[in-house]
Amino acid sequence: LISHKFSTVAPSGCFNALATIFDQWNDIQWLHDFFKANIDDLASYFKITDVNDAIYDTLEDSDKLECLILDISPDADLDELFRPLENSRFDERLLSKEKARIQNRPHHASWLRIYAIKLEPGKYIVTGGAIKLTATMQEREHTLRELHNMEKVRQFLVANQVIDEDAFVDYLKEL
């Protein structure tokens, strides 16, 4: 549950999705391999052709995003960071799919995304994250996998009647 404690509940069990994401985004070899494999997307959408530039930008954004997410100051507001997954959605929904990313990044938009299910205002369950180099998540296997994972987690929460923080805490006590 996120309100500055992060974990993901999935049918396969609990793990710290946030730690996994940031470990990956700070692994230079993993980033090098990822950007080499996705250089066409990086060049066409972001106009970046140097893998080293992409790695540097990712490390910088990852650090900033981690600081924003883990900010435990009284003024911290996760609702300012997370936005509806669908850019066209403006209404509140039960267990809505959300995304977080760095806003107002110089030179180009941030490609880092953290995906979560919103339990209630200020309370999120992180389901994963990705480097999104295309306009939609459906265009690439790794982002489509995150989309499917979000839906699996959402369906799991619905099936187990975990629709708010209290129900989440009760569910964890039963494990």
Residue ranges, per PLM feature:
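Short conserved catalytic/interaction loops centered on acidic-Pro-aromatic/His motifs
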Residues: 125-128, 135-136
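Basic, Lys/Arg-enriched alpha-helical interface segments
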Residues: 1-111, 133-135, 139-175
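Short, flexible active-site-adjacent loop segments at beta-strand->alpha-helix junctions, enriched
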Residues: 10, 120, 130
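Active-site beta-strand-loop-beta-strand hairpin of nuclease catalytic cores
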Residues: 118-126
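Short acidic loop-to-beta-strand element that houses the catalytic metal-binding Asp/Glu
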Residues: 113-116
